[in-house]
Each structure stands twice: as C-alpha cells, then as structure tokens.
Amino acid sequence: MKKEQTVIKFDNIKDLLYYSANTYADNIAFTTKIKNGKEVEYINHTYTNLLEDINYFGTSLYKLGLQGKRSAVVGHNCYEWAVAHLSNLLGGIVSVPLDKGLQIGELEDSLIRSEVESIVFDEKLKDIIEEIKNSGKTNIKHFICFSKLPGFLYFYDLIDDGKKAIEAGYSEYINYKVNPSAMSILLFTSGTTSKSKAVMLNQNGIATNIYDMQLVETFYSTDVNIAFLPYHHIFGSTGMLVMLASGVKTVFPDGLRYIQQNLKEYKVSVFVGVPVLIDKMYSTIMKEVEKQGKTRLINFMIKLSNFLLKLHIDIRRKVFKQLIDALGGNMRFVISGGAPLDKRVGKWFNSIGIHLVQGYGLTETSPVISAENDTCVKEGSVGIPMGSLDVKINNKDANGIGEIIVKGPNVMLGYYKNEEQTNEVLKDGWFHTGDLGYIDADGYLFITGRQKDLIVLKNGKKVFPEELEILINRLDEVEECFVYGLPDAQDSNDVKVSVEVVYNETVTKSKYPNATEQELKDIIWNEITNLPVDVRLLRPYIRKEF
C-alpha cells in the first residue's frame, strides 16, 4: 500500500536533506548504471549514502579553502553532479550550475563572470576544461573531475579524504549553519552568454517552492523518477530536490532514443519533462497505433472511458494497458513545463489513465509559479498559482490580458552585478515576468504569449505567435516553425504575420515520394492555409533546416 507523504516546511535545503536522510534512510535516492562492454552494473545510493557523500565531499571542499566561495558544476545528469551541487548548498558555497553544451568562449566567460574558484566537471569536457585551465583567465584554483584523469583532482579521492577528515574529528562543514536568505545559487538564464543574466537565488525561496509543490502534487516514496531535464536548469535541479524531499528514487536516462527502453527498464512512475519530450512519447506510440490500424478503436475507447469516468467508473489503466506498457508499464504521473503543451497531448495522457499536469515558472521564481494538480485541471491553463505566491495581471486590456507579475519568497534576489536590469523587472517587490496571460473567474492562470513576441496588427488585433506555432507544428509534414511579425511593405504602420517552416524530410518523402522540392512546399503551404487560423498569414519560407 502506498503511504501518503508528510509535508514539512523548511527554509533551507540542509534541513530538508537531513530530514529525508532520517525518514527515508534505506530508500534508494539514486541508481547509476555502469556499462562495461556487454555487462551492466547498477549501483544504488541510499538516502543515508547520499548525505554521507555530501558531507565527505563538502568537507574536502572546506579543506581546499572554499568555504564562503563559489564553485561551478558542469556535466551530464549523474549522481556525482547531484553530490557536488548539494555539497555546495549545505556548506554555504555558492553553487554555479552551467550548461555542458556551452562553447568554450561562453563557458569561460560564465566562469569569469560568476567568479568561481572551483569547478567540478564531466570527463567528456576534459579538453575544454584543460584549455580553460591553461588560459589562466579565470580565478579557478581547483579543477575536480568526476573521473580519474591526470592533472585534475579526482571526485572520489576527495570523498575518501573528506571521510578520513570527519573520522579524525573535523566537523566544520557538518556544523555549518545555512543562511536561508543569502545567495546560494547563481544560475545563468538561457541565451548567449553575452545576453544571459546571472540570477541570484536563495535557499528559502527554493525550499518554499518545494513545499508548495509537495502540497499540491502527489509523490510517493515508492515512486521512480527519471532525470531527463538537465540539472543545470532550475526546473531540473528543483525537480531533483522535490524528489529527494519525497523519498523518491531517481534514475538517469541513456539518451532520448532510449526513452521507452529506460522507462521499462527502471519501472519509471513519475516523469518531469518539457513538451518536446512528452510530444515525442505521444507521437511514437500513436504512430505504432496507426501502423496497427487501431486508431479508430483507441479513439472510441477513449470516448467510452471518459464517459464512464463521469459516472465514477475508471477503467482507463485496464483498457489502455497496452499503451501504458509502451511507456514502461508503471507510468502514473507526468509533469510538463518550460513551454506550452499541445492540448491534444495532455488530454490523451489523462484519457489513458496517466495523470498529466502542466506547470509554469521561470528561473527568476525558483521556478514554479503555478501548476495543475489532482483536483485543479482546466484545459489550456497552467493551473492555480502556488500557495506562497501572489500573482496578478498588470495593465490588463479589454480581454483581461496583461503582463503576469509575481510576488513571494521564491522570487530571485536580483541579477548578479546588474542593478539596471534588476530594477527593470523587480518593482516594489513584484517580479515582472514579461509573459502575457489572464486569470479566469475560477483562479486558473492562462499564458497567451511573451510580451516582447506579441504581434499587434494595425486593426488592433493581437496575435500570439506561440498559439500559431503549436497549431502549425501539429502537421505531420512540419518539423518545426517560427512565427513572427514583419513590417508591411505597403503600409509602414502595419505588420504581417510571417512564418518560417522546417519540413520533416522523412515524412514528406514517405507521403509524397515523387514530389519535387517546389511541389512539397506547395503541399505544406496548402496544409497551413487550411488550418483554423483567424489571421492572414504570409506564405511561409519553407526549407529543410533552419
């Protein structure tokens, strides 16, 4: 029988992790897969092991003189990444998670701007890190690798050293008292480094967000979560902490192409992802259903089960067992965030018995602002605002649409060394998100687009590019698209809604094997013009790739 979680409010991550280590001591916190040729080994790290390794590694960081300093973490999602990041948080070392995909110039610039004195990194980044080390442009004194490599400190040597120091009586790291209000994480927003902003977050804000999430979403200590979202993103790292606060086991994927295999291999029950991942899961399964000629049957059974559900008869997981098995067999809960999810996809998951909710948040809000839950789901919305937050719509238009602004403990401290940009978005304690939306009579929040992307036509009509992009992306022939406003050549006071489309070469060749390049473009344009769009579109620029 599944045991309901006990939700406790903490104001820092250290107390939260100590509570979890005590409550879920022998539960598995992380499982790591080690491949050696054809042989595969699974290493389980319990909650007790995790806290021990954090304290051992953190103690070594203190012995290196990093107390009160800053340390970067860069690499793929793994147990070592989690330990390095959490060791920073529990010891008052500002953690700077960085994107492993940055070019060397961008990575070096981020390291300089964040003023880190240590970096913990993945072996795959060895050449880049070595070049940065040799350049001498950063303040980094300690280069620590997850793997044993010449010229770098070894992660597990530091764990061994820290263990010995603690056994010899060293307790400075373990006894450190976290300041919940101080900057604890420095996160760069997405975009090129020259334009990205370094967001300062504190532990009280993150811990409050975790508490709010646990109050409205249901997690069990028997759940298994797969860490697809990169930990250097706030959505990924806070998601990791939500799982640790709930006693959940986290496993790591082998890559997007192995998603279905991994879901089955680990018996994954909870999946937190962005729409592109969730769309991929949906489309893969539905293509197989179509191939088997079962599309009409599935659609009929969805209508039937939804009707029975209104009578409080739930047959979904029995009737759609084959579809659920294609998602590993144990999937029960999916959380989507980071971008709008196609309404069809969300309805499909819920219709087959997998609870899917959408959330909305930003790096600057640690991150979740609102989310759907078991009892609060409304099509097209991103749920109800989190309990610790005040959310309102600023400068509403006639339709009640305006900028979403937020106030509460999980709002950032500001942008690091950028008072001007901080003052642009933080006014009287309210964070101005730059997102447009509205709150309906029931308190549900709806996102309509980005303020800076909004296209306003001469006749006053407002066009939200994101809505059109979702619609166009539904076409099988379309791989991706981009909607934007283009000045009207005939009227300088007006704009035209323009579209750029990348077509799916595999699909188009399969459906239209004898079509020329121009004929394919004509076919796609015809498909787009038949969409239910109440605005005139310029004929799109259609190509194979952006």
Q: Where are each of the predicted segments found?
A:
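Conserved AMP-binding/adenylate-forming core of the ANL superfamily
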Residues: 26-78, 82-86, 103-108, 163, ...
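Conserved AMP-binding/adenylate-forming
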Residues: 271, 315, 319-445, 451-454, ...
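AMP-binding/adenylate-forming catalytic core of the ANL superfamily
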Residues: 119-121, 408, 413-414, 436-535
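Conserved pre-ATP/AMP-binding loop-to-beta segment of ANL
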Residues: 25-28, 163-188, 195, 218-224
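Structural core segment of the AMP-binding/adenylate-forming
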Residues: 16-17, 90-161, 495, 505
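ANL superfamily adenylate-forming
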Residues: 36-39, 127-179, 285-322
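Conserved AMP-binding/adenylation subdomain of ANL enzymes
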Residues: 207-224, 231-320, 330, 355
